[in-house]
């Protein structure tokens, strides 16, 4: 099921707003993607590596202690944190790098915020013998030292971007610029369901495995579909992967949780769908956070994977068509959710995923015990432990 209504558009959102030189490269990418996305050999190889390299499928885990503590709906965790390298990112990276190989590319470039996509890209590049350059905002480099070191020992060159807010937006800009300068031999491995067509559709297809598994797993366990799917939203790749197979099931509520940072009434947040306006950002038409002069607003979140001032175009469409609902969680709510899951289930979730858990904590107690929530645990929290310790110390 796709909500794409004409090439590269979801309603009015999406498209490809890029210079001609980039459009030519995107046309070649789209051609290769269309050629291989239903190709039996390609899919066989892709699923082989998902199973044997990434360790899929990931469990759908009944969080019994958390369910009992909150006293309402049954809570299931989709354990994307158990993927190789600790997040959902590898689902997409394996697909894109296998595509790059078939296109004859020798080098890959990627942007990264929390570092998870960078680590996944560096690992897959090492596995498939490709040169790898990663662009990361200098502030994120400071926040995610361990992931930077991981990328480096995997053989990648990490470029710390010192411009602007020194976070994900600047990393995307720098990676894009580097790609344009080396467009013939380089493949841009985009980490989220954002950017110009065909990236949002391609990333969704490679992340769709999350909901393909979750749908089958919940039917096996409960003999029915869930009432609600909840996932955190930065650019939106884990959420679109978790939503994809459930979009046609109108009785299943889809809920995306953005970063409210220090609060929606401050300028320290990244709540794009809550407070953004429609314009062009990073080659796509979507909701984004802009100043009155048209410049992109600085965004903030405790979570380096959620501080992006835009949103994937399909999420913009799902919001406007009312198929999905988008809410937000503050830093405090996310940290409290992280600590609660850790104490109740012995699972340390990523601070990104903890935003989704914060919404579960709000909703589950208000629902009957026969209701079912699936929350996507998009990554594990090892990378965040030092930052959380610092955050709690300064409270």
From Swiss-Prot:
SUPFAM superfamilies: Tryptophan synthase beta subunit-like PLP-dependent enzymes
Metabolic or biological pathway, per its Swiss-Prot or TrEMBL entry: Amino-acid biosynthesis; L-tryptophan biosynthesis; L-tryptophan from chorismate: step 5/5
Named cofactor requirement(s): pyridoxal 5'-phosphate
Keyword Lyase among record annotations: yes
The UniProt record lists the keyword Lyase: yes
EC number(s) from the headed UniProt entry: 4.2.1.20
GO molecular function, one term: tryptophan synthase activity
CDD domains in UniProt: Trp-synth_B
Domain of life, source organism: Bacteria
Pfam families the record matches: PALP
GO cellular component assignments: cytoplasm
Catalytic activity: (1S,2R)-1-C-(indol-3-yl)glycerol 3-phosphate + L-serine = D-glyceraldehyde 3-phosphate + L-tryptophan + H2O
Positions of modified residues (N6-(pyridoxal phosphate)lysine): 89
GO BP annotations listed: L-tryptophan biosynthetic process
Enzyme class: lyase
PROSITE patterns xref list: TRP_SYNTHASE_BETA (PS00168)
Keywords, comma-separated and alphabetical: Amino-acid biosynthesis, Aromatic amino acid biosynthesis, Lyase, Pyridoxal phosphate, Tryptophan biosynthesis
Family listed: Belongs to the TrpB family.
Record NCBIfam families: trpB
Subunit structure: Tetramer of two alpha and two beta chains.
Function text: The beta subunit is responsible for the synthesis of L-tryptophan from indole and L-serine.
Record's protein name: Tryptophan synthase beta chain
Organism from which the protein derives: Fusobacterium nucleatum subsp. nucleatum (strain ATCC 25586 / DSM 15643 / BCRC 10681 / CIP 101130 / JCM 8532 / KCTC 2640 / LMG 13131 / VPI 4355)
Origin organism lineage: Bacteria, Fusobacteriati, Fusobacteriota, Fusobacteriia, Fusobacteriales
Gene giving rise to this polypeptide: trpB
